A protein has these predicted regions:
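Mobile active-site "lid"/loop adjacent to the S-adenosyl-L-methionine
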Residues: 226-240, 286-307
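A mid-sequence, solvent-exposed acidic-amphipathic segment
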Residues: 248-276, 280-281
């Protein structure tokens, strides 16, 4: 079999290894494999993996689908490994459930595949998150995209119009005049306005969503973290003006998510909606390697008990005859909860941009599937 051979899903082949290559997702070939060696491989959609899931030889005759880019930056976002991840999605499902929506890159990829007739969804698409402000952003993209874009554009134009000067940084400007002295001042002014509006007005207001998007793009590496007084992530100090979504891109996203049901609720409640034949993707706050791991996604965070509860509920999906894929860190808590004898585990190398000292640092993640 060579690069021109027709690749058939769910079939085993014995081939002579001619070339080793990494995919964009960074799945590494085993170091023991050598050119000229005969090896039996399990063939998956669009490529080949060995029985342990460690080798991926891409089918070079199949071009990658260009997925819609997400609107938001998000810690732990899957944009960099999305081409690898979606290869493990089932080609047909009853309903799709995404329990930790975040930046939405996986949801947008799935919807792109559905539009291109690569995946068939017989029922509905559900997207859940415990972050109410985030869910409201997507709802406003669905129903109020024109007003949302106008409000966001107002903040962007004001931000772009602020020129550099020698005025000292003021992280607590008392009024708009002080806020307009520096871009950093303006960020903190809008952050305070967001926290005030989110607390005192309708949380689903278009202006709250516009502020959410603006702050997300100008804060430190797309983090979302809440404290007692609300959103508290510092300014991002980007050398170039961050790239905000264009009107045409917003229209594309709005069209893609038109029939998605966005739901603000806990993952415990979300599991109750899953039925036989459904497919579930979970990308929770990652299980920690140590006490410094980032878990401040929402005000009360994820603790050990929360992770264990999530893992048990995920494993119960077997009893419902539902398929799932979970992304998580390759740490002891995860690997012991999902033994290889019972679940398929795929190792993936990913960049962890939350690292302040080394933003290009990488780590090993896992895809867990039943």
């Amino acid at each position: 079999m060579n690069n021109e051979a027709q690749i058939t899903s769910n079939t085993k082949y014995t081939i002579k290894v001619l070339k080793l290559a990494l995919t964009n997702g960074g799945v590494k070939p085993p170091s023991a494999l050598k050119r000229g060696e005969l090896i039996t491989l399990f063939v998956g959609s669009g490529g080949i993996i060995d029985k342990d899931g460690t080798l991926f030889l891409k089918n070079t005759t199949e071009s990658e689908i260009k997925f819609q880019k997400p609107i938001l930056k998000w810690v732990g976002g899957k944009t960099q490994i999305i081409q690898t991840l979606v290869k493990y999605f089932p080609p047909e499902m009853e309903n799709y459930h995404e329990l930790f929506l975040g930046g939405g890159s996986v949801l947008l990829a799935l919807l792109t595949l559905r539009r291109e007739d690569k995946i068939k969804i017989n029922g509905k698409v559900y997207a859940y998150d415990f972050n109410e402000a985030l869910i409201n952003v997507y709802k406003n993209i669905q129903t109020n995209k024109e007003e949302l874009f106008d409000a966001l554009t107002k903040y962007i134009k004001t931000y772009d119009g602020i020129k550099s000067n020698e005025t000292p940084i003021n992280r607590k400007p008392k009024d708009i005049t002080e806020a307009l002295q520096k871009k950093e001042n303006y960020y903190y002014w809008l952050r305070a306005e967001y926290n005030k509006k989110y607390k005192d007005t309708n949380k689903d207001a278009v202006d709250c969503s516009a502020l959410f998007i603006f702050i997300n793009k100008t804060c430190f590496r797309g983090m979302y973290r809440e404290g007692p007084n609300g959103y508290n992530v510092p300014y991002g100090h980007y050398k170039k003006t961050p790239t905000f979504i264009t009107k045409s891109e917003l229209d594309k996203v709005s069209d893609l998510i038109e029939d998605v049901e966005f739901i603000h609720q806990s993952f415990e409640e979300s599991f109750e909606n899953i039925k036989a034949g459904d497919f579930v993707y979970l990308d929770p706050p990652y299980a920690p390697e140590n006490s410094k791991s980032f878990v401040g996604y929402v005000a009360d965070g994820f603790n050990l008990k929360t992770h264990q509860n999530l893992f048990e509920r995920t494993k119960d999906l077997d009893k419902k005859n539902s398929k799932f894929i979970m992304s998580n860190a390759k740490v002891e808590l995860v690997t012991e909860s999902f033994p290889k004898a019972e679940y398929k585990i795929i190792d993936v190398t990913a960049r962890r941009a939350i690292n302040a000292k080394n933003p290009d640092a990488t780590t090993t993640e896992v895809f867990i599937m039943n």
